[in-house]
Amino acid sequence: MPPSGLRLLPLLLPLLWLLMLTPGRPVAGLSTCKTIDMELVKRKGIEAIRGQILSKLRLASPPSQGDVPPGPLPEAILALYNSTRDRVAGESAETEPEPEADYYAKEVTRVLMVEYGNKIYDKMKSSSHSIYMFFNTSELREAVPEPVLLSRADVRLLRLKLKVEQHVELYQKYSNNSWRYLSNRLLAPSDSPEWLSFDVTGVVRQWLTHREEIEGFRLSAHCSCDSKDNTLQVDINGFSSGRRGDLATIHGMNRPFLLLMATPLERAQHLHSSRHRRALDTNYCFSSTEKNCCVRQLYIDFRKDLGWKWIHEPKGYHANFCLGPCPYIWSLDTQYSKVLALYNQHNPGASAAPCCVPQALEPLPIVYYVGRKPKVEQLSNMIVRSCKCS
């Protein structure tokens, strides 16, 4: 068990950036943050990383450098390190950072399925194996004007009584009338209604981009090779046309719908600029003169900066850090200015503004010696890949 201080270092690392602030003039745009001494930032960052590496390896102090054998690493150890490094690089390329809009509060909207019996459904061949759900995309765009504003989308279905266990599958309709598999669910028998939910965030983002008038899903019974009966046994509310009057109205209100969580357009106007549509990652921040919240370069040379010779690979790495103001999206003529004034009165040294913090972090594989035995280990959350205001 490492000392309690070392165990807390990964949690305290974001706070160290706040301690780097030096007295100075507040920046513009209603930010209460102060000017920053970049050399102090880097020195503090290097010391934080020193403690973080030792903590992750459960070491109270660096290993004795005299025990490190000279010469190249064994081939097997080098191959293991290279494969670990390549895997991390591959995972990093596949990972997409969360949209910047995820910082803001979300508005929840419900978009009902086009009512069963509409002529749209006439195009689908009647089947005991499947049911179809179509949605008017103009209603989707009214709720979510731009794909970047969408945070989450679920298709929700009210399952009524089910006498037998059934395996169901959800599919997305393509414009060429083909179907793409999305997800599946094993439903247990029950006498009570139950809401089923499927995450379709990626699909709805596609719909908002493609501009088709009608889009849809298909819910089907799982087709097993050794099963002769592929009938969809589950009864989903909203697909019976025999009801009349008030009962039909109540029944229709609970028909399948899309539950959307999105940032209101007026709350995220700054996302409209191409600059803010970019992820605040190394690809953007390192090639621009961005002054607001962004990833800043910080290279750690293990020998030069930390005085360590016991880490054999890599010789150093780009730790990076987040820096830059997060301007308010409110103005002084709002009611919030009274709250802000009261907050500053009771917390004169604190910042009421959002802070620039890491959003995506990558691990760092290393090779080091314990005595005369080489070890390959992966240190989690060591490289800042992108930032956000939070």
From Swiss-Prot:
Assembly and interaction partners: Homodimer; disulfide-linked. Interacts with the serine proteases, HTRA1 and HTRA3: the interaction with either inhibits TGFB1-mediated signaling and the HTRA protease activity is required for this inhibition. May interact with THSD4; this interaction may lead to sequestration by FBN1 microfibril assembly and attenuation of TGFB signaling. Interacts with CD109, DPT and ASPN. Interacts with EFEMP2. Interacts with TSKU; the interaction contributes to regulation of the hair cycle. Interacts with TGFBR3.
Role: Transforming growth factor beta-1 proprotein: Precursor of the Latency-associated peptide (LAP) and Transforming growth factor beta-1 (TGF-beta-1) chains, which constitute the regulatory and active subunit of TGF-beta-1, respectively.
The name this protein goes by in its record: Transforming growth factor beta-1 proprotein
Region forming the signal peptide: 1-29
Span list, region Bowtie tail: 226-252
Glycan attachment residues as annotated in the record: 82, 136, 176
Region ranges (Arm domain): 75-271
Keywords carried by this UniProt record: Cleavage on pair of basic residues, Disulfide bond, Extracellular matrix, Glycoprotein, Growth factor, Mitogen, Secreted, Signal
Motif (Cell attachment site): 244-246
Gene Ontology BP terms: ATP biosynthetic process; cell-cell junction organization; cellular response to transforming growth factor beta stimulus; chondrocyte differentiation; epithelial to mesenchymal transition; extracellular matrix assembly; extrinsic apoptotic signaling pathway; hematopoietic progenitor cell differentiation
Single annotated GO MF: type II transforming growth factor beta receptor binding
PTM field: Transforming growth factor beta-1 proprotein: The precursor proprotein is cleaved in the Golgi apparatus by FURIN to form Transforming growth factor beta-1 (TGF-beta-1) and Latency-associated peptide (LAP) chains, which remain non-covalently linked, rendering TGF-beta-1 inactive.
Gene Ontology cellular component terms for the protein in this record: blood microparticle; cell surface; cytoplasm; extracellular space; nucleus
CDD domains: TGF_beta_TGFB1
Family as reported in the entry's similarity comment: Belongs to the TGF-beta family.
Keyword Signal annotated: yes
